[in-house]
């Protein structure tokens, strides 16, 4: 579901989805002088004595790829993206999917004739990223950071404030921006630039995305140039834009939980509804519970509503409720002997403490409204 949101937003940005090789020739990395410069590069020897890198990023592949298709300024701008497994030889792989040596990433690359066009796309990409994260139920800060191995310019990170984070971010509660500790020019206790009544403070954050203005660095390495309107050859300008997809899922959990378990935002919940049927010692009542639960399940599924049905016969009500809170789907419906005597089901939203009774004949319509709201 996270990937579907990303694809929607990338397509809306005018980017085309492709899929590139994870195995990358050493020669490409030598051309950009990054074979020895990037310390997280997995290097793989082949039986033919050739060396390859397991892709941590794809500038070395996408640049010569675009070169094969673009020769005129009339073909620009171009934007391509992929969602693919990446590999980085992290010294401190930890925290599950938040920092691993193998992870899923969406990487977008844009190619432009002029700096003005690149900057325009860069700003559009920034707004699109904010939209992606908002749709995933997250509040993010746009944070100035170092360009690292990608560029000497500053980059922008998208940080989610959580104690599970490794990055130090200087920001304030109402400020949508911030500065990474690597490049901070402001200090703790300074007045917030946009909200002077608030003081800046250091917070921990998880980086869920980043965007870079690459300039002509990679284009020059691969001689990616086009003939401009004046008939002159000029290097193409590039931007790259990443979202850690698997890290994003882990960050949603870190940001959206309580002591009982996960609280999935509606847009990315694995299912929209958890249906629980409780056992009855009375045979006729048990048959009625099963009949009503099955009917509800089928009616909701027909409406396109995703339902996880806990019909385990060997689990107690307490176990089922605890597991429902742990899994954290947005809505829990309970069919039980007590409820059916009232011709009702129990309705409990994961974000609320209190449950309520809803008449059987109203349930499907109410669930539809809840899911779409």
For the regions a language model picked out, list residue spans one by one.
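NTP/phosphate- and nucleic-acid-binding module
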Residues: 1-373
